[in-house]
Each structure stands twice: as structure tokens, then as C-alpha cells.
Amino acid sequence: ASGPVRRRFGLDDDDLATMTRWVSDSGIRWGYDQAGRAPFALDVEPQGTWRFGLDRLLVGVTVSADGPLQVGGVMPLDDVGSGSVDLVGRVSELLARIGEGLDRLEHAGPATEWMDALTETVLSLTDVPPRERWQVGDLQRTLGSAARHASDEVPLRLADVRVLLADQLAGRPSRASFRTGGLTVCTMTPMRSVP
């Protein structure tokens, strides 16, 4: 998980290791839920989705070791003790916000709606320290610029938004400051003519 996501949900290295184990143990493979698999005609069974894995995790943390083998057709995930309630709650919140973001990005709409949805999704999933808040403003300016370059009369799909944002999010070239007395770290290609 990136730093801003870790900060938003209070995740440390031990939490990430535990989450990785849970993902493996619960059989999560791909797809947020059955609806996310529908375009691939694989929405018959929920097993292997993030939603089903989360259900197993939630049942595992709430049912004791000698409890029922299934609750509502869901087998509890083993080795999820009551001491993990806080982490399970944070994982549940993270996945709920991802699900909300996916819902926002599912429908065609004007560019301004897309940029608002992207901003809301990013802000709900991330938190940056005060000295790095400029990144939030930079994101909003970049998305605003992209929205101004598109017509609000034409509904856009996700693929259209990707194309619209490709140039906006591409890296910006900077002027090289070779031989200015400072330390220059680069690949050999820019310095190939220097003896």
C-alpha cells in the first residue's frame, strides 16, 4: 500500500503482512464482487472476490473457534482472533471505500462529474501529512484542467477518461542542470558525451 493509503487507514508493516496472509487464506483472487465479474460472464459464484473474502474475515473475527461451521453460507476464516477486530474494521472500511469508488466510476457522464468522482475517491482513500498537502491541490488543478479540455455535452466512459488524463498525468520533463557544481545523478545516456 502506498504511504497516503497507509496513513489514511493507519496501516503499518505488520498490518500489511497480516492482511496479505488473510488475502491468501480467504482465497481472494480477483474482482471486487459478483457484479464486477459480470462483464466476463463469471458472476455465478462469489468465491474468490474481495467481497466474499471480507465476509469470511468478518465471520472469522465474530465467531468463536468452537462456533458454527458456516454463517449465512460463509465459512469463517481461521486464525482471526478477537484481537484483530480493529484491523478487520480498517480493512472493511478500506474495501467499502474502494467499492464506493468503483460505483462512482462505473457510469458514463460529463467530464466534470468524472473529475469530481475521481477527486472524491482519491480523497476518501488517502491522507497526506500537512507538509505534503500541496499534492491535493495539484491533483485538483490537474483534474480541473482535464475537465476544461473536454466537452460536458458528451458523456464519457472510463476508457475516454483514461485517454483524457493520459497527457495530464504524464511526467513533466525538466531541464537538466549538468555541470553546475552540484551532484548530478542520472543514467549514462544524458552524460555520454562527457569525458
Regions inferred by a protein language model and the residue ranges of each:
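Polyanion-engaging groove/track-forming segments
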Residues: 1-195
